[in-house]
């Protein structure tokens, strides 16, 4: 019998050459790409590769983490600057202006875990940084680039959520108060008010550690994935209270990352089962299961134009053009 639905298309193209598992991906914003779309990848071998999506080749390799895995990459809005977080307990700030590839500054970190940092831009030249703290359950908040400590967020003694596994800094359109969403080892998601140094709300939506989360501030709705089989969708009401809205059970356990496309139409997950899954964000209707990689998928990222990139333990980066942005 013929299949009812045609299989999803293969990747638009594949990037090879990292020679190591790909832990994290980040598209360069169009405003900084100068007509040459770029993708940043961070690998298990401690290298950051800058790829041209036109030539599909590595343009530059950054080596600043002493062979220790790179787990997070983020560009800053003020010019050609890139943040890279490595398991060498260092967060590097790179100057990429006019072809340079030098480390401008670095922050010494206290946690060697796999929790990626998060930033919140506070002005043209300053931004807030959230990273795992010295205590196993702590999150440290810094004002950058001065590295001034804002606070340390530590759960109540009887809470015991375990280590923070993923972080998301944000603020509402109506308020300049910085907020932090943190996913923890015990399967909980917590909303912190940074100014008050207090927990606004906390929900337990997973039985396993929360491995990734993303938040749509326009809809006041977020999603989290874990080491288990469940994707959880939760919302935030006007009283800053988190509520689980729905859950979606996957075939196989293990979500390494979940990310919502910039236009808030679809989302993608990186699966330990080698699969990339794509969902409609409003309804959570499954749209595609992309079976290309031969090992766990560790990261997914969207470009501003909707292009999807996925990185895997198989050392390949797949680039997909699905449901183009209108």
From Swiss-Prot:
It holds the Pfam family WD40. Expressed at low levels in most tissues and highly expressed in adult testis. Widely expressed in adult brain with striking regional distribution in forebrain, midbrain, and hindbrain structures, including the thalamus, hypothalamus, amygdala, hippocampus, pons. Keywords: Cytoplasm, DNA damage, Nucleus, Repeat, WD repeat. GO terms for cellular component: cytoplasm; nucleus. It is found in: Cytoplasm; Nucleus. GO terms for biological process: DNA damage checkpoint signaling; DNA damage response; social behavior. InterPro entries: G-protein_beta_WD-40_rep, WD40/YVTN_repeat-like_dom_sf, WD40_repeat_dom_sf, WD40_rpt. Disruption phenotype: Gnb1l deficiency causes lethality during early embryogenesis. WD repeats lie at residues 17-61, 64-104, 159-202, 205-244, 250-291, 292-325. The keyword ATP-binding does not apply. Acts as a critical regulator of DNA damage response (DDR) signaling via specifically regulating phosphatidylinositol 3-kinase-related protein kinase (PIKK) family proteins. PANTHER family: GUANINE NUCLEOTIDE-BINDING PROTEIN SUBUNIT BETA-LIKE PROTEIN 1, TRANSDUCIN BETA-LIKE 3. This is Guanine nucleotide-binding protein subunit beta-like protein 1.
